[in-house]
Amino acid sequence: MASVEKVPMLAEGYEKLTAQLAALKAERPLIVDAIEEARAHGDLSENAEYHAAKERQGQVEATIGDLEDKLSRAQVIDPTTLSGDRIVFGATVTLTDEDDKPVKYQIVGQAEADAKAGKISYNSPLGRALIGRRVDDEIEVTVPSGDKYYLVTKIEFI
């Protein structure tokens, strides 16, 4: 049974998922054509083109179902409408690490997360540690490379 839990995301993430869904739906007829063409080659038991096209069809249909589910449960959040002194979904947070090096992250949904772009999932170890914190709070995060310590220096809603 599908979950009814809301999926928080920014408008940018919603648009990205919508574009992915449209691209996959556009690919559907191409896959059907590839299956028909491969089927025309005869014996399906040893027809690699046919099996590859059927496998791709299964992947595309599964991804379409997943995207439609996420989009139907999406709760689009505009961080510019938020305020407060605590870190919440959508906030942009400046932290200082153990070497006094500032790092900046925005708390986003799982589908939008891209650490290199400064976007971390609210469900990630760091994201979970940040939610609810305030400026001057110290946090400890256990990541694969070990324990990291940060100081929250700024919270913005941009």
UniProtKB/Swiss-Prot annotation:
SUPFAM superfamilies: FKBP-like, GreA transcript cleavage protein, N-terminal domain. The keyword DNA repair does not apply. Pfam families: GreA_GreB, GreA_GreB_N. Residues 53-75 form a coiled coil. Gene3D superfamilies: Transcription elongation factor, GreA/GreB, C-terminal domain, Transcription elongation factor, GreA/GreB, N-terminal domain. GO terms for biological process: DNA-templated transcription elongation; regulation of DNA-templated transcription elongation. Disulfide bonds: none annotated. One of its GO terms (molecular function) is RNA polymerase binding. InterPro entries: GreA/GreB_C_sf (IPR036953), TF_GreA/GreB_CS (IPR018151), Tscrpt_elong_fac_GreA (IPR006359), Tscrpt_elong_fac_GreA/B (IPR028624), Tscrpt_elong_fac_GreA/B_C (IPR001437), Tscrpt_elong_fac_GreA/B_fam (IPR023459), Tscrpt_elong_fac_GreA/B_N (IPR022691), Tscrpt_elong_fac_GreA/B_N_sf (IPR036805). Belongs to the GreA/GreB family. Necessary for efficient RNA polymerase transcription elongation past template-encoded arresting sites. The arresting sites in DNA have the property of trapping a certain fraction of elongating RNA polymerases that pass through, resulting in locked ternary complexes. Cleavage of the nascent transcript by cleavage factors such as GreA or GreB allows the resumption of elongation from the new 3'terminus. GreA releases sequences of 2 to 3 nucleotides. This is Transcription elongation factor GreA. It comes from Sphingopyxis alaskensis (strain DSM 13593 / LMG 18877 / RB2256) (Sphingomonas alaskensis).
